[in-house]
Regions:
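Short, acidic, metal-binding catalytic loop of nucleotide-sugar glycosyltransferases
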Residues: 23-32
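A recurrent flexible, glycine/aromatic-enriched loop bordering the glycosyltransferase active site
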Residues: 139-145, 150-176, 198, 227-229, ...
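Active-site-adjacent helix/loop segment of glycosyltransferases
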Residues: 8, 207-304, 308-312, 318
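A short, conserved alpha-helix in the catalytic core of glycosyltransferases
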Residues: 161-218
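Short aromatic/hydrophobic "clamp" motif used to bind/position activated sugar donors
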Residues: 84
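A conserved acidic beta->alpha catalytic loop
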Residues: 24, 39-48, 64
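Conserved donor NDP-sugar-binding/catalytic core segment of glycosyltransferases
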Residues: 91-142
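Glycine-rich, basic loop-to-helix element that forms the pyrophosphate-binding segment
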Residues: 61-79, 89-91, 100
Length: 336
């Protein structure tokens, strides 16, 4: 029996991306695969554009902008498929981008989530920030990728052409078995956006599933989406959500030593923003901590539903120190 696959784009005022990139998506997606656009109450005529130009695409409209996490939850509740492919509107796909990933996931029941190779749309021989060749975190919760440490992006010279287990898959192009999505309750809607895929993958690993990288599938990501590259709101979400995913998923004995160190390191980051004359970014870090503390009762309830366990592919070190003090700028130097 053929598995039913649905490629689902969550759109918010991304008509320009849809106009530019839907043609290649339609061209390179097998006809038996459903293409769905969920719309977060866009005001740029995205829905009208789709209706006029792509009548074959299913449109699911949310009544307001619920953000990436809850927006996807509401849309995917209405999609019937065995596999969900969460695809950003600013991603260009290539020929044969679906088949190798599905083949890999079908061959191993334990693989619940998978990502393709993510390259830069503008620098096409370079890994892209949002996912590269698969995501990892260090023991303090700082995320990085094969092919991308902080702002250092590696050229793709085939060095990461091995399929392997990773810690998290990029939300820009994430393949998920629908039964696992439902088992885990989808993304955490309280995240709104940013790092929700890391939390989702960690919960999947805590539930005994695997997250994988498939280099035979290649996509190109513009990046940045609908928030500007430097945004206090983005800073707020990244700092708050990172604390939230640590609180939810770390084993109890790890929480006691990780959190004090992370609080100290966040203060260092906040003071660095002040020294760079970025007071709004400093304030965003402070607000992130305040909002996290406010949410602790809710997070405790969420934590009780997760079976925290020791999971693979967490870097047992401090990526900040390795990168800035020891000058380890590429993934291979970490010795993972």
């Amino acid at each position: 029996m053929m598995k039913k696959i649905a490629v689902v784009i969550l759109n918010w005022n991304g008509k320009n991306f849809l106009d530019d990139l839907l043609p290649t998506l339609v061209q390179h997606t097998p006809p038996e695969v459903d293409i769905v656009v969920g719309d977060n109450a866009s005001s740029d005529n995205s829905v009208e554009f789709l209706k006029q130009n792509y009548p074959q695409i299913q449109i699911i409209q949310n009544d307001k902008n619920y953000g990436f996490a809850e927006g996807y939850n509401r849309v995917l509740n209405k999609v019937k498929a065995d596999y969900f492919v969460l695809l950003n509107s600013d991603v260009e796909v290539t020929p044969n981008w679906i088949e190798p990933v599905i083949d890999m996931m079908e061959a191993d029941d334990d693989i619940a989530i998978c990502q393709p190779k993510l390259l830069s749309f503008y620098n096409r021989d370079t890994f892209e920030y949002a996912g590269g060749a698969g995501g990892y975190i260090d023991k303090y919760g700082y995320p990085f990728c094969r092919g991308r440490l902080f702002t250092t992006l590696e050229k793709d010279n085939g060095q990461y052409d091995d399929a392997c287990e990773i810690f998290w898959a990029t939300g820009a192009a994430m393949f998920v078995k629908a039964k696992v999505w439902k088992q885990l309750g989808g993304l955490d809607g309280d995240f709104f956006a940013h790092m929700e895929e890391i939390d989702f993958c960690w919960r999947a690993k805590n539930a005994g599933h695997k997250v994988y990288y498939c280099p035979q599938s290649v996509v190109y990501h513009i990046g940045g989406g609908t928030l500007p590259p430097s945004s206090p709101f983005k800073t707020f979400l990244n700092f708050r959500n990172n604390f939230s995913l640590l609180f939810k998923n770390l084993q109890k004995r790890q929480l006691t030593y990780v959190f004090p160190i992370r609080i100290l390191m966040d203060w260092v980051a906040a003071l660095k923003f002040l020294s760079e004359k970025k007071p709004k970014e400093f304030t965003a870090v402070m607000k992130a901590h305040w909002d996290f503390y406010r949410q602790i009762p809710t997070l405790k309830h969420k934590r009780k539903k997760i079976n925290q366990r020791k999971v693979s592919n967490i870097y047992n070190g401090n990526i900040v120190l390795e990168y800035y003090l020891k000058d380890k700028k590429i993934f291979s130097k970490l010795g993972m």
